[in-house]
Curated annotation (Swiss-Prot):
Name of the coding gene: FAM204A
Regions annotated as coiled coil: 144-164
Record keywords: Coiled coil
Biased composition (Basic residues): 97-109
Annotated InterPro entries: FAM204A
Annotated spans, Disordered: 1-126
UniProt lineage: Eukaryota, Metazoa, Chordata, Craniata, Vertebrata
Regions of compositional bias (Acidic residues) in chain numbering: 13-24
Designated name of the protein: Protein FAM204A
Length: 233
């Protein structure tokens, strides 16, 4: 409603029509809000009902499993439930035992791998110690020109196999010759290693004996000299 005068270009009939239109718009807006609220309430009810359904189904299944069905005696049903519980407990224990066995097998594998890695390392250290003495005494050997080279029986057999074009036999004999030469080198290196070790032990024992001997101090030496001089007085 207009208080006072109307604006220019408007009549009372126009003002009444405008007020009626505003009222209808307000009523329609209220109706829309009410419809939206009703829809939201319905959606929440549907969601609650859907969430409650699986719980009720699971509970009903559990109750149906625990309850004795019709036509079966109660004693038999109780025995069946006890057997079912024992079976489930056995499954759980077997699964735990398998897990422990797997852990043990993994630990055993790791131990074996560590042992395998440690063994080659010790062998490698021993081999390095021996390789230091390879060819140590070669300088004492006479030169090749003055040496009377005499072929061994194995070398003669290799030459014979080569002349007969028997390559496989020649390769086998050459491998045997190489292993023999390597064995000789290793034996010489071991002898040198043992000699050096024994020499070091003797030197260390001599040094320890020298340390045990009491060294003459300046004052002790002076006293000894004075005592010896007093004997001649």
């Amino acid at each position: 409603m207009w208080s006072g005068l109307l604006p220019p270009g408007l009549n009372e009939s126009d003002a009444e029509s405008n007020s009626e239109d505003e009222a209808t718009l307000e009523n329609s807006g209220l109706n829309l809000q009410e419809d939206k609220e009703d829809e939201s309430i319905r959606k929440t009810e549907i969601i609650d009902f859907s969430t409650d359904e699986p719980k009720t189904e699971t509970e009903s299944n559990v109750n149906a499993y625990e309850e004795c069905p019709s036509g079966i005696p109660i004693d038999m049903w109780n025995k069946f439930q006890e057997l079912h519980k024992k079976h489930s407990e056995q499954k759980s224990t077997t699964s735990r035992f398998r897990g422990k066995r797997r852990k043990r097998s993994r630990k055993d594998k790791l131990k074996n791998e560590k042992e395998l890695h440690s063994e080659p390392s010790s062998n490698e250290t021993q081999w390095k110690e021996l390789t230091q003495y390879f060819g140590v005494n070669d300088r004492f050997d006479p030169p090749v020109k003055r040496k009377k080279v005499e072929k061994s029986g194995l070398e003669k057999r290799i030459d014979q196999a080569v002349e007969e074009w028997n390559i496989e036999k020649a390769e086998e004999l050459s491998n045997q010759l190489a292993t023999r030469e390597l064995g000789v080198k290793i034996a010489k290196a071991v002898a040198c290693h043992n000699f050096v070790k024994a020499k070091k032990e003797v030197e260390n024992s001599q040094a320890a004996r020298k340390k045990k001997k009491l060294a003459w101090g300046f004052e002790a030496k002076k006293r000894w000299e004075t005592k010896s001089n007093m004997g001649y007085m």
